[in-house]
Swiss-Prot record:
The lineage of its organism: Bacteria, Bacillati, Cyanobacteriota, Cyanophyceae, Oscillatoriophycideae. The keyword Cytoplasm applies. The keyword Iron does not apply. PANTHER family: 10 KDA HEAT SHOCK PROTEIN, CO-CHAPERONIN GROES. This is Co-chaperonin GroES.
Length: 103
């Protein structure tokens, strides 16, 4: 099977889905101890890089999403689908998995 090359800028989420670039995990503890990859906690914060058109309502209209491209968001720990593109980590989430917008 041939590998498919996908450019991040071409990803277009469907419905109420949001494509988020995951912030890097902390590599050191507060005391300065380096953590191995398997001991690092999965980050729950990232930057929105693409949003879907919104959830379709019963009347056929779409509900606008509360977040937009460029927003930093906090999301549920085990939510979404993890995606790796061009060596970077991303997660595809439903809007309901977003807990907060972070300034």
């Amino acid at each position: 099977m041939a590998a498919i090359s996908i450019n991040v800028s071409t990803v277009k989420p469907l419905g109420d889905r949001i494509f988020v670039k995951v912030s890097p995990a902390e590599e050191k503890t507060a005391g300065g101890i380096l953590l191995p990859d398997n001991a690092q906690e999965k980050p729950q914060i990232g930057e929105v890089v693409a949003v879907g058109p919104g959830k379709r309502n019963d009347d056929g209209s779409r509900s606008e999403l509360d977040v937009k491209v460029g927003d930093k968001v906090l999301y549920s720990k085990y939510a979404g689908t993890d995606v790796k593109l061009s060596g970077e980590d991303y997660v595809l989430l439903s809007e309901k998995d977003i807990l907060a917008s972070v300034a």
